[in-house]
């Protein structure tokens, strides 16, 4: 499906580039879209590992009602050769995920990247984002990220003994607050987390009753040559 691959490529031309291996490994983020009913959201993270230099691409499909991966996902591709490019890893990941991308018509329902706050943004506040659900000057909502100490998993006990979890609080345009996520444990998929940053907000459906918001959280974990950054998507209904 070269045409779809070209479409995906065009979508990400201006995306944040992955950090070089000498400064840790910070994955770039690209949203792939929503299903028409908003019950599925997908995104890609990609980059080059520090230490090994291997290129990778991970494509996640999120059930926005259950806040869980769809069965059989995510698709994780890692090119274990020194001369493999990031584009090659991404092409392989798209090939694996293509049927699901088509089944859910994701490219027809991009949603809105309502706010974006990558690690390169120096705004003095890594834990709060104020955003509008739709560009039509809809009311301003707020997402607040807080961290707290949480016991590391067994594999990370000696690496990050001061591990942390996070909670997310949504503040409506009317000022009402609601907790939408709080870690109870640290999954192994996060590796050994050191800290978190609120990286952005995706929205779908505007301000209607079926609207879906997705908090984008950057997980900062211990890497080989410095901290690494990976993405988590936390969906909720406002």
Language-model-derived ranges and their functions:
Residues 1-9:
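Bacterial N-terminal signal peptides that target proteins for export
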Residues 22-238:
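Exposed acidic/polar residues on beta-strands and adjacent loops within beta-sheet cores, strongest
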Residues 18-20:
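N-terminal signal peptide c-region/cleavage motif recognized by signal peptidases
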């Amino acid at each position: 499906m070269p045409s779809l691959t070209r479409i995906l490529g065009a979508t990400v031309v201006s995306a944040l580039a992955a950090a070089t291996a000498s400064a840790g490994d910070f994955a770039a983020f690209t949203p792939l879209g929503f299903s028409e009913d908003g019950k599925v959201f997908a995104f890609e993270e990609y980059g080059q590992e520090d230490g090994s230099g291997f290129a990778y691409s991970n494509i996640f499909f999120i059930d926005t009602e259950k806040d869980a991966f769809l069965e059989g996902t995510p698709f994780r591709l890692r090119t274990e050769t020194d001369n493999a490019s990031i584009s090659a890893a991404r092409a392989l990941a798209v090939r694996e995920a293509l049927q699901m991308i088509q089944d859910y018509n994701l490219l027809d329902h991009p949603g809105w990247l309502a706010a974006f706050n990558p690690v390169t943004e120096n705004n003095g506040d890594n834990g709060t984002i104020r955003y509008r659900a739709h560009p039509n000057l809809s009311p301003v909502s707020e997402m607040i990220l807080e961290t707290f100490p949480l016991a590391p998993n067994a594999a990370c006990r000696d690496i990050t003994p001061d591990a942390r979890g996070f909670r997310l609080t949504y503040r409506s345009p009317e000022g009402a607050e609601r907790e939408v996520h709080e870690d109870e444990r640290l999954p192994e998929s996060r590796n050994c987390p050191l800290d978190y940053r609120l990286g952005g907000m995706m929205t779908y459906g505007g301000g209607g009753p079926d609207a879906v918001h997705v908090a984008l959280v950057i997980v900062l974990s211990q890497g080989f040559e410095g901290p690494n950054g990976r993405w988590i998507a936390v969906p909720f209904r406002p």
